[in-house]
Amino acid sequence: MAKDVITRALLRPIYKIYEKILWSQIKDGPFPFHVGIIPDGNRRWARNNRLPLDQGYYTGYVKLRDVLTWILEIGISTVTVFALSAENCEKRTQQELSMIFKYLKIGLDELLTSDLVHKYQVRVKAIGMLDKLPEDLKKLVVDLESTTEKYNKKKLILAICYGGRQEILDAIRKIMNDYKLGIIDSKSIDESTFRKYLYDQELSDIDLLIRSSGEIRISNFLLWHLAYSELFFVDVYWPDFRKIDLWRAIRSFQKRKRNFGA
């Protein structure tokens, strides 16, 4: 571990130079409008560094705060973070969920008073099976959403206890109910109608999805919104995610020709 710390310290000046080179390549855009983030690898990072699991979640939380700052500073309009999947919400041990909820609470508390949120006028919203959250977290979500609902320049979506299939199933159930009530008819159901029944009907499609930890999959995240997304997988655990990784993801996005299925 000490050797790794020394290596990182020696490489830091090189990373700074590379960071500036990358920024010079991407600064003129275009930038993605909506970025999705799957911050994966907190547990493995802790194990690899022989640290308590709690330290992995804490370091991952701090990293997320940094990355959101970088993203807002360069003008990206919408960010959706996969904070906790529905599967993990149901299958992780109570001890581990307590750790996750602890840092969710810290993060939501910070967002409530964050200068960054108010400076960039970020509207914050949570989506997912929020009824599974502890009562104090539910209240924080409500407070945060009501505090920022007047903002419309930027948007931060927190997917908590979220599953993409579940969202689509919930939308279908609501459509069926409205059909039975005569509110809609079958001929009126198209993509734009379906979108209105999703957790956030105003949420745009994701332009760029970034996933850390080297895993190459989307893990049931925003399935409807990922239909035409550009995907970027970075081979570092989330706590080790660097600004150069974000810049490389954006550079990759800028080099791609998007044809939206055509």
From Swiss-Prot:
Substrate binds at G41, N42, R43, R44, W45, S85, A86, E87, R92, R211, R217, I218, S219. Keywords: Magnesium, Metal-binding, Transferase. The active site is at D40, N88 (proton acceptor). GO terms for biological process: polyprenol biosynthetic process. Its cofactor is Mg(2+). InterPro entries: UPP_synth-like, UPP_synth-like_CS, UPP_synth-like_sf. One of its GO terms (molecular function) is magnesium ion binding. It is an enzyme of class 2 (transferase). Binds 2 magnesium ions per subunit. PROSITE patterns: UPP_SYNTHASE. Belongs to the UPP synthase family. Homodimer. This is Tritrans,polycis-undecaprenyl-diphosphate synthase (GGDP specific). It comes from Sulfolobus acidocaldarius (strain ATCC 33909 / DSM 639 / JCM 8929 / NBRC 15157 / NCIMB 11770). The lineage of its organism: Archaea, Thermoproteota, Thermoprotei, Sulfolobales, Sulfolobaceae.
